[in-house]
Amino acid sequence: MLPNLNRIPQVEQYVLDYLDDLQCQHFEGDIATNYADRLSLATDNSVYQQLPQAILFPKTVADIVRITKLANLPEYQSISFTPRGGGTGTNGQSINNNIIVDLSRHMTAILELNVKERWVRVQAGVVKDQLNQFLKPHGLFFAPELSTSNRATLGGMINTDASGQGSLQYGKTSNHVLALRAVLINGEILDTSAVNSVDVLENIDALELSESSKKLHQTIAQHCKEKRAAIIKDLPQLNRFLTGYDLKNVFNEDESEFNLTRILTGSEGSLAFICEAKLNLLLIPQYRTLINIKYRSFDAALRNAPFMVKANALSVETVDSKVLNLAKQDIIWHSVNELLTEDEKDPILGLNIVEFAGNNKEKIDRQVTALCRLLDEKIEHNQDHIIGYQVCSDLPSIERIYAMRKKAVGLLGNAKGAAKPIPFVEDTCVPPENLADYISEFRALLDQHNLQYGMFGHVDAGVLHVRPALDLCDKEQVKLFKQISDEVAELTIKYGGLLWGEHGKGVRSHYGEKFFTPELWHELRYIKTLFDPNNRLNPGKICTPLDSKDELYSILSPMRADKDRQIPIQIRDEFKGAMNCNGNGLCFNFDEHSIMCPSMKVSKNRVFSPKGRAAMVREWLRLMANENVSPEQLDFRKTEIKLTALVKRLSNTVQKWRGNYDFSHEVKAAMDTCLACKACASQCPIKIDVPSFRAKFFHFYHSRYLRPTKDHIVANLEIAAPYMAKQAKFFNYFTKLKVTQTLVEKTLGMTDLPLLSEPSLQQQLVEIHYQGKSLEELESLSAVEKNDILFIVQDPYTSYYDAKVIRDFVMLTQKLGFKPILLPFKPNGKAMHIKGFLKRFSKTAQNQAEFLNRMAKLGIPLVGVDPAIVLSYRDEYKEALQEKRGDFHVLTAHEWLKQRLQNADLQEKLKNIAKTDRTLGWYLFPHCTESTFMPNSPKEWQEIFGRFGQQLNVEKVGCCGMAGVFGHEVQNQKMSREIYDVSWHKKLHGKDPHFCLATGYSCRSQVKRYEHVVLKHPVQALLEVLK
């Protein structure tokens, strides 16, 4: 039995007092002090980890004013704050050990848009892609491009002065910030924008500013004016100019304007809370073309890049073979393999993605033609190691290429082995003309340590992302981490560059003095003193105030690995999904129609995300290791939950009801909101697979605490369903009674229970004169006779609750000339796995696997109708049974149809089968698990419908919110409905439900209960076409 985990770091009393007083000040936002909430924001996208005391989620600028004004009381002077946005920073910018102020949950409003003048005013928590989605109908966009654009907030972009692809033309974020509204540490609101330099320097009273604002404007303007010559002379001359703090660009080129905004952009929250921003917008280019140039080596791609820049391309992105090979193993490659074809004998080892864009089509065509002509000449003469190139000008193809490039960062984290590519020297920047030589020396530095690494980036701007693979759980490699960091810092100085060309400084700030002269470093500290004299805003980053004894963070600041190292290696291996999470945050994707992660999308609570759940489990494992729990105790295959422990479990459960704390309860709360949709198992670049370690957690959690009755009912549904189906009328009568529904809700916590099929599947098969065959008859058939037979593998949901789907699939296959055989129903066990009955699941899976292996030996295809169940044979069965699983293979309905429809005889037969003479427009709503594990399935369904003379439109939808039993649990009703409304309801609205199709039983059930319509399975639509 596992121990009670109650020894956790407590919140300091002075912080609790502050939070109590803040609530009395009518703070409207959220306050979080739970250990789970603190853990979820203890990390960002870096290797670092610091546990905050508390998290504040303000709703308004007024809330931030309340936060800061209260903090100025004498008793709260020791409290420090760190603003936080999307948490995508790679250098620890948004973590600290005091109070985090997270603006991403509530401050997400787009406040004002002026299309004519091309500007927009937003709150700091707006996500970049969210803004561009809003702007797209107006033909406008916010330019700076990031690989994390679907979860990075504009406040975070401003604070790090982010930039990315296309920066030669579009510049950095600061080039597009027209004005800011910020809150100072003293609680005053600071508005900044471009003002007349003369007014600032000589007539400050002419400006409508507060007294403190006047002082900031005038003092900084005077200092930057006095130091202007030194600033221009001593700072690196780069497209990715030095920010944090941007001394150079506070004045425009002719020094007629002064803009304090440029000091705040890139300040990483160390000067003020940036709350709102007025942003410059650009016209969306009407015409875009990519030329994807393939090379035999990365060095060739790198050295060929300046040639592309001279062709006046908008951007040149370079990717090495390490990243490309990881992409080929990911779901993303299915979307780009036709755009990046290769010969196995001549593989792509380097790639340049060259983009031309603008509103003059003829000009772009000329540029593309000219470059292609030069490339053809080089290929003809075997120059520059170019394999070939492919051109794409359609927007969907362009977006797919860039989606692959954006995912490259996360893909590196999925490298095999304990050493993982990590960010710490990944955004160095040197003058583009020095890049090839610089990278050559950089690679030599890494090669001398025998390190693996991936490279990709913006070679046109002299920025290349490099992530060396290190195992920071190994203390020797931590030393190497420091050594490499120091050496690369010196290398960038040697080549006239910067250690931070794109992602800000963060904990790397302690290298800052190396890149500034003593005179200019003093100016930075002076600016910090003006804004934050007591070093209370993101302390340890950028610089410290003058006369401060505080120090900057070290590159060896507390790391995630410091905690992970405490967990035995065997346990890390058993829970490697949780351990491998690198914080990339793709599960925070704002897109409401993306599959990952449904609970995070509607709750806005990062605990309820794959990253949050991974953090919970890692800490759970660490705390148990500290309680001397052995690896054997955390191997469900080696543990038994004995009946003799029932009394103890009952006692523990009573203590839980009485409010006794156990961190395991917080972990369980995070796991209870997981829908087990499996999106994270494929959509996450690291493929962390929360449902897998969630099931293990439930198994162990319930070795200490009793299970709720509903878990036992769910786990035994497959056993009971066949018996209940024989008396469907009887059970349905009682299920429909209001008193029964109320009783079930109150006592079992279940609601909206589905009705058994009437008539039953067996009765419906009798009606269509279906006849099966015995095993003896099947074994006596010849190979030719077996060719027309298929085995239908039943699942409990369609067979007993949606039997018409099975009947119609039988009829469809018969009409196509096949002889379907319905195999005897046997439990699959998926529900047991979801609820953590792992011992029972393994036994059930073994029985089903033995049966299906026996059937597979007959050489007859096995076909299932519900994709979630079919895919469990490939996933959960493989994990649980390993080599004992056998080699049986169950096809989904569309896989079987696709295979059969490739037969010329069947194609000819299909032409002669009587079917509707109309081409109907159907809409497919794919099951989320099917979409993630089988990314080509929607396209394959389209091909199948095309064979039937029909048009199938695929709707991009997220999770429906049902997910098996999740949507039937009373505690999940609010979340289930919100998940449904955010995607499915919107996509179904306005469409004729008769032509809307859903492959998943759960999805059809969810639509039925909220829309009161019944969607068809695609096989039913095909049958209708044949009728």
Swiss-Prot record:
Domain 4Fe-4S ferredoxin-type: from-to ranges: 665-696
Positions contributing to [4Fe-4S] cluster binding: 674, 677, 680, 684
Top-rank taxon, per record: Bacteria
Alphabetically ordered keywords of this record: 4Fe-4S, FAD, Flavoprotein, Iron, Iron-sulfur, Metal-binding, Oxidoreductase
CC cofactor: [4Fe-4S] cluster; FAD
Keyword Translocase in record: no
Gene3D superfamilies the record matches: 3.30.465.10, 3.30.70.2740
Coiled coil (residue ranges): none
Enzyme Commission designation: 1.1.99.39
SUPFAM superfamilies listed in its UniProt record: alpha-helical ferredoxin, FAD-binding/transporter-associated domain-like, FAD-linked oxidases, C-terminal domain
Domain annotation FAD-binding PCMH-type: ranges: 48-284
GO molecular function: 4 iron, 4 sulfur cluster binding; D-lactate dehydrogenase (cytochrome) activity; D-lactate dehydrogenase activity; FAD binding; flavin adenine dinucleotide binding; metal ion binding
Claim: Transmembrane helix is one of the keywords in the record: no
PANTHER family in UniProt: D-2-HYDROXYGLUTARATE DEHYDROGENASE (PTHR11748:SF119), D-LACTATE DEHYDROGENASE (PTHR11748)
Function: Catalyzes the oxidation of D-2-hydroxyglutarate (D-2-HGA) to 2-oxoglutarate. Provides the way to recycle D-2-HGA produced during L-serine synthesis by SerA, by converting it back to 2-oxoglutarate. The physiological molecule that functions as the primary electron acceptor during D-2-HGA oxidation is unknown.
Family: In the N-terminal section; belongs to the FAD-binding oxidoreductase/transferase type 4 family.
Quaternary organization: Homotetramer.
Annotated protein name in UniProt: D-2-hydroxyglutarate dehydrogenase
Protein's organism: Haemophilus influenzae (strain ATCC 51907 / DSM 11121 / KW20 / Rd)
